[in-house]
């Protein structure tokens, strides 16, 4: 499976969790290569397949996973 995003060097902490900003590595869905997305704690928080994406300042951390064609905007998801 080809990765669709990478973790950038841009990080910040929330409630003791270190979050990484994501950057698209290829075009998919409404996302273009080079687009910056929201932030995740680990790669399992956002699937590399399908068209799912985390936008802007949205955060996904803990055991939460975004997959399928789900889009996360302006909120946090954690489990």
Tell me what each language-model feature is.
Residues 1-51, 69, 75:
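Terminal amphipathic alpha-helical/low-complexity segments used for targeting or macromolecular assembly
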